[in-house]
Regions:
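A structural boundary/capping signal
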Residues: 2-147
Length: 147
């Protein structure tokens, strides 16, 4: 996707592929998908889950793994948000950036009313999601520089 396409696309662009069908999800997963329909609701849901400190070794859980284990770290949260919100018309866009100390942070990226926002989970509350108030991706990313 080009920068121009990202700037001009609506929050529900025509999809190149359809989201997974309902029967791809287990009943508990589908219940969560139906309960949390907006980025704000998904952000609240992810904040309610314990942080996955990976005490037994590194993990990379899918949405299913997050629901089974009921904990989440930043990448897992972004994947879970994408799985949930794709069912409600949001493209599954992830944004990954790396700090100077080589720590990555991954967020689910969305647009509402022409403004960019994120859904995110972190050990640091300053790195959680952002409301859709940023006119450009650069402004959104810069909001994470010194939270």
């Amino acid at each position: 996707m080009t920068r121009r396409e990202l700037r001009t696309r609506s929050p529900n662009p025509q999809r190149m592929t359809a989201p997974p069908p309902r029967d791809a999800f287990r009943p508990k997963e589908w219940e969560i998908i139906q309960k949390y329909r907006t980025p704000r609701q998904v952000q609240q849901f992810l904040r309610s889950l314990p942080y996955n400190w990976e005490k037994d070794g590194e993990t990379l859980r899918t949405f299913r793994g997050v629901i089974e284990n009921w904990s989440v770290h930043c990448l897992e949260a972004a994947l879970a948000a994408a799985a949930i919100l794709e069912q409600h018309g949001y493209p599954p866009l992830l944004l990954d950036f790396e700090s100077q100390d080589k720590l990555d942070h991954v967020l689910f990226l969305f647009r509402q009313h022409g403004r960019w926002g994120t859904v995110a989970r972190s050990r640091d509350a300053g790195l959680h999601g952002r409301k859709p108030m940023f006119s450009t991706l650069r402004k959104l990313v810069m909001s994470y520089v010194d939270p």
